[in-house]
Curated annotation (Swiss-Prot):
This is AP2/ERF and B3 domain-containing protein Os05g0549800. The keyword DNA-binding applies. Keywords: DNA-binding, Nucleus, Transcription, Transcription regulation. Residues 1-75, 168-188 are annotated as: Disordered. The keyword Nucleus applies. GO terms for molecular function: DNA binding; DNA-binding transcription factor activity. Pfam families: AP2 (PF00847), B3 (PF02362). It comes from Oryza sativa subsp. japonica (Rice).
Length: 394
């Protein structure tokens, strides 16, 4: 017997008004919880709550505390859920005991779904770190559905550990360099972020746009306060270029030890952080093109030296184009098909050789065609010969 029938029986048996009200409230509460659960139910994981509908209200009707992490939503049972959006569709990543654990699950999914430009709660994985590089390869070797399934089943760390062991077993040991010290500059660098340059970044604008989240985190600027209070005046000020931060000079050292100086500033008109002066010379010398990546690093020591590195995409070789060009030239320079001449009764009969096909099927068709042509030519020759004989006898 369900709760509704119990309430009806209680009401029919002459229960007090207070009991009726309590039973009705309990029935209403049960219906509300059931409705909220169905609204936030995920088909792939029954019982998972989303960030819409009833997820902001607990059993007593109060609001749940919001999370400070991206992609993390609180649950009425005190646990924390993680989710990510893919093509405007919510992908539920599972329910976790701790808020930080749910945030790490979101970071894993974000780096698989978004790639190197993913915005994460904690430090993103970098290829410069050997451990992180192994995890990046592990994520790249798994599909999005497989990563989501591992996160939901809480088996991601176990699968990652097994993959690291297998990778270490088949990888050769790194060469030993006694002269190198653990305090070398390359080992002490901290990877900040990578920026994939766009056509406008390497064009004639002479500027590189730094993503806002990375700029405010790693290269903060003291922006001037707004000088106007009117929205119309503020818009006019922005259109005129007012409010722009003059910026500072940042020194970056590349892999060859050369120091590059860039002017780093904030453009109020486009509300973007940019590297301007010195950037075009860097693009020209490094040969950057759209799609190449630029990495930014900082020394882990007290000097906080900045480093810059280029990751140029492999350009397609021209061997295939050269081979195609040579084949086209050879085809154009090929001699015309041979022409056979047959002299019959003082008349030259010209017959052109049929082109040969390369494949076996084409060869068979050509052979049959030749036979038909030979038969037709022989019949024509017989008729022509007969006419010539009759003409000679008359």
């Amino acid at each position: 017997m369900d709760s509704t029938s119990c309430l009806l029986d209680d009401a029919s048996s002459g229960a007090s008004t207070g009991k009726k009200a309590a039973a009705a409230a309990a029935s209403k509460a049960l219906q509300r919880v059931g409705s909220g659960a169905s609204a936030v139910m995920d088909a792939a994981e029954p019982g998972a709550e989303a960030d819409s509908g009833g997820e902001r209200r607990g059993g007593g009707g109060g609001k749940l505390p919001s999370s400070k992490y991206k992609g993390v939503v609180p649950q009425p049972n005190g646990r924390w859920g993680a989710q990510i959006y893919e093509r405007h569709q919510r992908v539920w990543l599972g329910t976790f005991t701790g808020e930080a654990e749910a945030a790490r699950a979101y970071d894993v999914a974000a780096q698989r779904f978004r790639g190197r430009d993913a915005v994460t709660n904690f430090r993103p994985l970098a290829e410069s770190d050997p451990e992180a590089a192994v995890e990046l390869r592990f994520l790249a070797s798994r599909s999005k559905a497989e990563v989501v399934d591992m996160l939901r089943k809480h088996t991601y760390l176990e699968e990652l550990t097994q993959n690291k062991r297998a990778f270490a077993a088949i990888s050769p040991p790194p060469p030993k360099h006694p002269a190198s010290s653990p305090t070398s500059s390359s080992a002490a660098r901290e990877h900040l972020f990578d920026k994939t340059v766009t056509p406008s970044d390497v064009g004639k604008l002479n500027r590189l746009v730094i993503p806002k989240q990375h700029a405010e985190k790693h290269f903060p600027l003291q922006l001037p306060p707004p000088t106007t209070t009117s929205s119309v005046a503020a818009a006019a000020d922005a259109a005129a270029g007012g409010g722009d931060c003059k910026g500072v000079l940042l020194n970056f050292e590349d892999a060859a030890g050369k120091v590059w100086k860039f002017r780093y500033s904030y453009w109020n008109s486009s509300q973007s952080y940019v590297l301007t002066k010195g950037w075009s010379r860097f693009v020209k010398e490094k040969g950057l093109h759209a799609g190449d990546a630029v990495g930014f690093y900082r020394a882990a020591g007290k000097n906080a030296q900045l480093f810059i590195d280029c990751k140029v995409r492999a350009k397609p070789t021209t061997a295939a184009a050269a081979a195609a060009f040579l084949s086209a030239v050879a085809a154009a320079a090929a001699p015309p098909p041979a022409v056979k001449a047959i002299r019959l009764f003082g008349v030259d009969l010209l017959t052109a050789a049929a082109p040969e096909l390369q494949d076996a099927g084409g060869a068979a068709m050509t052979k049959s065609k030749r036979a038909m042509d030979a038969m037709a030519e022989s019949q024509a020759h017989v008729v022509f010969k007969k006419q010539c004989i009759e003409l000679a006898l008359t």
